[in-house]
A protein has these predicted regions:
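Residue at a conserved register position within TPR or TPR-like alpha-solenoid repeats
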Residues: 71, 140, 174-175, 254-255, ...
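TPR alpha-solenoid repeat register
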Residues: 63, 165-167, 200-202, 246, ...
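Post-signal peptide N-terminal segment of secreted/secretory-pathway proteins
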Residues: 29-141, 145
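Structural motif corresponding to the intra-repeat A-B loop/turn of tetratricopeptide repeats
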Residues: 74, 143, 178, 257-258, ...
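Bacterial Sec-dependent N-terminal signal peptides
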Residues: 1-26
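Short coil turns that delineate tetratricopeptide repeat
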Residues: 55-58, 111, 161-162, 196, ...
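Structural register within alpha-helical repeat arrays
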Residues: 60, 67, 74, 136, ...
């Protein structure tokens, strides 16, 4: 029994030493300025081995870190020969998201463990990457490449969701500018449900140089600039103050994209409570009901023609008349709601009057003059 325990202990020790060797190899290669093809192979081999054998939390954290960083090591190995395409491969949404996650996870682990191996480097790397990504996105926006700019702003958000909520809003707005309304709907929904929208604060201050109020980005940065004498008159504003406008935008997008009608109804009703005099919302709300009703009766002329052809056949005639009434009965609630939303609309008034007459409700038809 002791031999078995000893063997297990020995195997565990060997595995532990192997993991330490792999970590040393990865750390050494990762720190190099110039990476050879041999280094690249050694890095990949050590990374794969560490991922398979890691059992301790620290080993798992760094196994994920080194695996995720592999594309950056590949790029570094190409040196001056790296093409624009090689560099842009690091700007794929999937990698940017993983890159941001692994940086945050590694920073959190090193803070918890008190052993800061990469923290200072990663904090700088994170900031530099965000600045670079933001600069590219802004340049694309300035050259009217809205779809591409939207994609990069969204990637910036997925890279650092806690700090880049405003980038998600930029992505949504630019998707609209690019006329990609389906993507805009997705981004605006995500923005509306984000922690940034619900709890975020915008930190404003007036630039002394030009007298304009500007969004400084963070409370810490604003305090610093005010202390330097560059800004004055600080003001805070909750992000969700724009709730009415975001709901308005979502209402228009849901209508544009012919999205779920219940979702549109709930959104436009909530938006109109906040913006009761908004004409676009009024029209969107009206059309939501009117169009659903009209969709049901759009083939009524054909049905009337069929009915007129069978006046000599009472059975078929009665069946078609009954069927027509059933269709108008289904459409009635939509026309009534449309009329309630916009009682001055002549189309709604006339079609509602006709519907009442077809359904044998003459009193309601007369009242609807």
């Amino acid at each position: 029994m002791k031999k078995l325990v000893l063997s297990a202990t020995l195997l565990l020790s060997v595995a532990t030493f192997a993991q330490k060797d792999e970590l040393k190899t990865l750390k050494k290669i990762y720190a190099k300025e110039t990476i050879s093809e041999k280094d690249l192979i050694a890095y990949k081999t050590a990374s794969d081995a560490l991922e398979t054998s890691a059992t301790e939390e620290s080993d798992k954290v760094y196994a994920k870190f080194y695996k995720t960083m592999y594309p950056t090591v590949v790029l570094a190995s190409k040196g001056a020969k790296a093409t624009i395409q090689d560099q842009m491969s690091l700007y794929k949404p999937e990698f940017i998201k993983e890159y941001g996650e692994v940086i945050n996870e590694t920073l959190e682990f090193e803070k918890k463990s008190g052993n800061k191996i990469y923290s200072d480097e990663l904090i700088k790397e994170k900031g530099d990457f965000k600045k670079g990504l933001s600069a590219i996105a802004m340049n694309l926006n300035n050259t009217s490449k809205f779809k591409e700019a939207s994609a990069l702003f969204y990637s910036l958000y997925t890279f650092d969701p806690k700090e880049e909520g405003s980038s998600l809003q930029n992505a949504a707005y630019l998707a609209t500018q690019a006329k990609d309304y389906v993507l805009a709907e997705k981004y605006y929904e995500e923005f509306y449900n984000s922690d940034y929208f619900k709890n975020g604060i915008i930190y404003y201050a007036v630039n002394k140089a030009n007298g304009k109020e500007e969004n400084i980005g963070s409370k810490e940065m604003r305090t610093k600039y005010i202390g330097m004498g560059l800004y004055e008159k600080p003001r805070d504003e909750r992000v969700d103050k724009s709730k009415a406008e975001i709901l308005r935008t979502l209402s228009v997008l849901y209508a544009q994209n012919d999205s779920d009608k219940i979702k549109l109804e709930n959104t436009v009703q909530e938006a109109r409570k906040l913006l009761p005099n908004d004409e676009d919302l009024l029209i969107t709300h009206f059309n939501l009901y009117f169009n659903q009703g009209y969709e049901l009766i759009k083939d009524d002329m054909k049905m009337v023609e069929e009915i007129n052809k069978v006046t000599n056949n009472k059975k078929i005639y009665d069946e078609l008349v009954t069927k027509r009434k059933e269709i108008f009965a289904k459409a009635l609630p939509f026309f009534e709601k449309a009329f309630q939303v916009k009682p001055t609309d002549e189309s709604a008034k006339n079609i509602l009057k006709i519907t009442y007459e077809i359904l044998g409700q003459p009193e309601k038809a007369k009242a609807n003059k």
